Amino acid sequence: MLVPKRVKHRREFRGKMRGEAKGGKEVSFGEYGLQATTSHWITNRQIEAARIAMTRYMKRGGKVWIKIFPHKSYTAKAIGVRMGSGKGAPEGWVAPVKRGKVMFEIAGVSEEVAREALRLASHKLPVKSKFVKREAE
């Protein structure tokens, strides 16, 4: 699973998810991509589940690029603990994804296979997404 090797601060502020993604809005490595149409936090487990769904459907053919990384920690208090007494313990890692960001890219397979693989991956993610092709240069 994807986790940072080391971080400067264990507990981060939640931050705001305003507007569109600044960069990474075009397919740059592969031929086809999965672009987010809504903003959300995506956990490292969801990224891994989407990756497995894609690679299993493609029968280990083609190449997959994961263009998001869960660098932000989120915290949670234990169940049954009263409010107050500081921030909770780090619970997991998330990748904040804004709308417009291309999350996954695929190359080396036909468009039909890529479309279905990315559709299966999109069911594992909490964001609405669409299939995009590389722009002709």
From Swiss-Prot:
Part of the 50S ribosomal subunit. One of its GO terms (cellular component) is cytosolic large ribosomal subunit. This is Large ribosomal subunit protein uL16. Binds 23S rRNA and is also seen to make contacts with the A and possibly P site tRNAs. The keyword RNA-binding applies. Coiled coil: none annotated. HAMAP family: Ribosomal_uL16. GO terms for molecular function: rRNA binding; structural constituent of ribosome; tRNA binding. The gene is rplP. It comes from Streptococcus thermophilus (strain ATCC BAA-491 / LMD-9). GO terms for biological process: translation. Belongs to the universal ribosomal protein uL16 family. Gene3D superfamilies: Ribosomal protein L10e/L16. It holds the Pfam family Ribosomal_L16. Keywords: Ribonucleoprotein, Ribosomal protein, RNA-binding, rRNA-binding, tRNA-binding. The lineage of its organism: Bacteria, Bacillati, Bacillota, Bacilli, Lactobacillales. InterPro entries: Ribosomal_uL16, Ribosomal_uL16_bact-type, Ribosomal_uL16_CS, Ribosomal_uL16_dom, Ribosomal_uL16_sf.
